[in-house]
């Protein structure tokens, strides 16, 4: 099983070398040849990764979502893509459609757990979170720094046992 933290760090090292925050997952996706589009989606859908044989994958984001939600959804779909590349399933057809709600974060689906953890580590790398925490930066300021919601930041702080 792939380690989402290591995979996110590899992507950051290779494609986001300037270490500026917030990390822009759309720019990273484009540098990997992925198209990212926004469109009207059903309310229960937050995003999707769609791959047809012989065609580059497309990440679809819900056009009405808040910018921070779109960033996390994009990073999440990128996580699905990275897991496919690493498992050498690059040209097969596949589709991930991510639904909102409690069932999306229960931790029962390994692919979803990987994509969520990858997204969190891409947008909020552990070392930067710890650095800001040591400096006693307020949570809302940290969330702005990373371009995520305060809720996502608190989830990350809790995962690092900093809350």
Language-model features, listed with the residues they occupy:
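Active-site hotspot residues in diverse enzymes, especially metal/ion-binding acidic/histidine motifs
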Residues: 1-163
């Amino acid at each position: 099983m792939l380690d989402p933290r290591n995979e996110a760090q590899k992507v950051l090292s290779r494609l986001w070398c300037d270490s500026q925050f917030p990390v822009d997952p759309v720019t990273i996706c484009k540098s990997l040849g992925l198209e990212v589009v926004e469109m009207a989606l059903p309310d229960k859908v937050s995003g999707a990764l769609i791959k047809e044989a012989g065609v580059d994958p497309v990440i679809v984001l819900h056009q009405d979502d808040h910018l921070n939600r779109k960033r996390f959804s994009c990073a999440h779909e990128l996580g699905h893509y990275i897991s496919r590349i690493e498992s050498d399933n690059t040209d097969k057809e596949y589709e991930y459609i991510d639904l909102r709600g409690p069932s999306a974060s229960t931790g029962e689906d390994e692919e979803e757990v990987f994509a969520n953890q990858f997204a969190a580590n891409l947008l909020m790398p552990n070392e930067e979170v710890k650095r800001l925490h040591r400096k006693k930066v307020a949570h809302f300021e940290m969330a702005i720094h990373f371009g995520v919601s305060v809720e996502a930041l608190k989830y990350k702080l809790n995962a690092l046992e900093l809350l």
